[in-house]
Amino acid sequence: MLRNLLALRQIAKRTISTSSRRQFENKVPEKQKLFQEDNGIPVHLKGGIADALLYRATLILTVGGTAYAMYELAVASFPKKQD
């Protein structure tokens, strides 16, 4: 049993270490050019439509959450009267 387990471990180790790596294109230089460009756009919106949507969703959730928290604090500060 132990011999089979050790053999399986060696096979798995060999498979992982000898598998070919995927080659990805290095996009860092082009992203650096995009984000360092002086075009008047805020850096948090330079990524395109996805960044703009993420920014707006974050803004809406933050404002909505703050308003809801203030509402709940106001409700909690004026308890219902008991008859």
Swiss-Prot record:
Mitochondrial intermembrane side stretches: 78-83
GO process annotations (BP): mitochondrial electron transport, cytochrome c to oxygen; mitochondrial respirasome assembly
Protein name: Cytochrome c oxidase subunit 7A2, mitochondrial
Keywords: Acetylation, Membrane, Mitochondrion, Mitochondrion inner membrane, Oxidoreductase, Transit peptide, Transmembrane, Transmembrane helix
Pathway: Energy metabolism; oxidative phosphorylation
SUBUNIT field: Component of the cytochrome c oxidase (complex IV, CIV), a multisubunit enzyme composed of 14 subunits. The complex is composed of a catalytic core of 3 subunits MT-CO1, MT-CO2 and MT-CO3, encoded in the mitochondrial DNA, and 11 supernumerary subunits COX4I1 (or COX4I2), COX5A, COX5B, COX6A2 (or COX6A1), COX6B1 (or COX6B2), COX6C, COX7A1 (or COX7A2), COX7B, COX7C, COX8B and NDUFA4, which are encoded in the nuclear genome.
GO cellular component terms listed in the entry, alphabetical order: mitochondrial inner membrane; respiratory chain complex; respiratory chain complex IV
Highest taxon listed in the record's lineage: Eukaryota
Membrane-spanning ranges: 49-77
Listed SUPFAM superfamilies: Mitochondrial cytochrome c oxidase subunit VIIa
Functional note: Component of the cytochrome c oxidase, the last enzyme in the mitochondrial electron transport chain which drives oxidative phosphorylation. The respiratory chain contains 3 multisubunit complexes succinate dehydrogenase (complex II, CII), ubiquinol-cytochrome c oxidoreductase (cytochrome b-c1 complex, complex III, CIII) and cytochrome c oxidase (complex IV, CIV), that cooperate to transfer electrons derived from NADH and succinate to molecular oxygen, creating an electrochemical gradient over the inner membrane that drives transmembrane transport and the ATP synthase.
Family stated for the protein in its record: Belongs to the cytochrome c oxidase VIIa family.
Mitochondrial matrix side: 24-48
Annotated membrane topology: Single-pass membrane protein
Cellular compartments annotated: Mitochondrion inner membrane
Keyword Nucleotide-binding set for record: no
Gene Ontology molecular-function annotations: oxidoreductase activity
